[in-house]
Amino acid sequence: MKNFEPSDKVIKALRQVVANSYAVLGQTQICHWNVRGSSFFSLHSAFEAQYTELFPAIDEIAERIRALGAFAPGGLGNLAKMAGMKEIREDASAQDMVKHLSAANNALVADLVSARDAAGDAGD
C-alpha cells in the first residue's frame, strides 16, 4: 500500500464539489420557497428533504478539505464564482424546477465522480 499524499488535484476537485453542492442546495431551497401549482405539497416536501440532506454532506466534504491541509471555500460570492451551474429562475414552473434540479444534480454527480477518481489516483 502506498503512502497517501494529498494532491492539488484532489483538493481542487473537492473544493469544486463544495461550491457546486452549495449551488444545488441554494437552488433547491429557492424551489422549495417558490414552487406552486398542483404539485406544491409533494415538491415542497421533496425540495426540503433534499436541501436538508445536502448540508451535512457538504460539511463532511469541507472538513475533508481541511484534513488535507487546505482551506474549504467560503463566502457566498466566492462560492458563486466557483460554481459552474446555471441559476434557477425564481418564477420557474414546477416542471421547470424539477428539470433544472435534475440537471444540476446530474452535474454534481459528475463532479463527485471526478473527485472520487482524483482521490483514488492519489491513494486516498
Regions found by a protein language model. Give the residues of each.
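Helix-loop segments that flank and shape redox-cofactor active sites
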Residues: 2-9, 24-49, 111-124
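Conserved alpha-helical segments that form or flank metal/cofactor-binding pockets of metalloenzymes
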Residues: 36-78
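Conserved acidic
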Residues: 13, 39, 46, 97, ...
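Alpha-helical transition-metal enzyme core signature, strongest for iron centers
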Residues: 17-28, 47-61, 65, 105-112
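Acidic/histidine-rich alpha-helical segments that form the ligand environment
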Residues: 63, 80-124
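Short alpha-helix boundary/capping motifs
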Residues: 6, 49, 56, 75, ...
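Disorder-to-helix initiation segments
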Residues: 1-17, 94
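N-proximal short alpha-helices
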Residues: 16, 20-27, 34, 70-74, ...
